[in-house]
Structures are given as structure tokens and as C-alpha cells.
Design a protein with these regions (language model features):
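N-terminal Rossmann-like FAD-binding beta1-loop-alpha1 element of flavoenzymes
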Residues: 2-28
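Short beta-strand/turn micro-motifs composed of small residues
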Residues: 8, 31, 95
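Conserved FAD-binding subdomain of flavin-dependent enzymes
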Residues: 19-22, 33-91, 101-113
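Short amphipathic alpha-helical surface micro-motifs
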Residues: 27-31, 73-77, 120-128
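Flavin (FAD/FMN) cofactor-binding and adjacent substrate-gating region
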Residues: 83-144
Length: 144
């Protein structure tokens, strides 16, 4: 008999189930649509640190959680004998106008101090990337 029942076999539900099993729990996962059916409606499948201004404990917790992801997914791969598909590539966001560019540059400086090289927020030229979203200014934010 399961000690814990998790509803949802998407990335979050399966990750919670894995963490519970690692701690010795007996777990069952229930999802009427099957594993990874995409019913959560998420379109990105990615997480990134919060913007650096107004830094608080919640934002620090999310950043710290994201930093633990590499070790988590390595353990999943080792247990499963396959590639979990984890990659820390970052995301690209177009910069809309001069005001957004100034804000992005300010955030890059704040991120350096707060994230201490563990994650990055960079302002880069769109032309410097092999693929880029349309950017009215020709600039992108790349955060990891």
C-alpha cells in the first residue's frame, strides 16, 4: 500500500515521486493522461532565477533549487540508465526598447552581485547567437 499518492505524472509530479522514493517512501503516481501528457499547459518546460531586483528569500530559494537540479538529474540518469534530457542552456528574451535595455543592463549588474557566478543574466547582441527571437532593439537577455 502506498504511503504517498501523487496526482500528475508530469515533470513536477514525477520529480516529487522520485524525491519521496529517495527518502524511503512507498509512492504511487496517478495520472489519467499518462506520463508527460502535457496537461499542465506549460509551454516552456524551463525554470530560471527570478529577476534580481527586490531580492528576497523566495527568490533565493528558487535560485538555490535550480542550482541543485544538475545533481538531481544526474542521480535520475544513474538510476534509470538513460539520458534525462537535462540541460542548463538558459533562455533568450528579446529587449523591446531603450528603457527595457537600460533595465536589462541594470539587472545584469545586480545579478552578478546576487548570483555570484552561479547563474547569469547577460545582455547580448542578437546577431551573436546562432538562433534568436525577433528583437526590435537587436539586443537579447540571456539568463541561465
Amino acid at each position: 500500500m502506498a504511503e504517498i499518492t501523487i496526482r500528475g505524472a508530469g515533470i513536477f509530479g514525477l520529480s516529487v515521486a522520485w524525491a519521496c522514493v529517495q527518502r524511503g517512501a512507498v509512492v504511487q503516481v496517478i495520472d489519467p493522461n499518462g506520463p508527460a501528457a502535457g496537461s499542465s499547459g506549460g509551454i516552456v518546460g524551463a525554470l530560471a532565477p527570478h529577476v534580481p531586483e527586490n531580492w528576497n528569500a523566495k527568490k533565493a530559494f528558487q535560485r538555490d533549487s535550480l542550482l541543485m537540479a544538475e545533481g538531481f538529474w544526474q542521480a535520475v540518469e544513474q538510476a534509470g540508465g538513460g539520458n534525462a534530457g537535462y540541460a542548463r542552456k538558459g533562455r533568450l528574451q528579446p529587449v523591446a526598447d531603450d528603457a527595457a535595455l537600460a533595465l536589462a543592463q541594470q539587472r545584469a549588474e545586480t545579478a552578478k552581485a546576487l548570483w555570484q557566478g552561479q547563474a547569469t543574466w547577460s545582455v547580448i547582441r542578437a546577431s551573436d547567437t546562432p538562433w534568436q527571437p525577433d528583437s526590435p532593439t537587436g539586443w537579447l537577455i540571456h539568463d541561465t
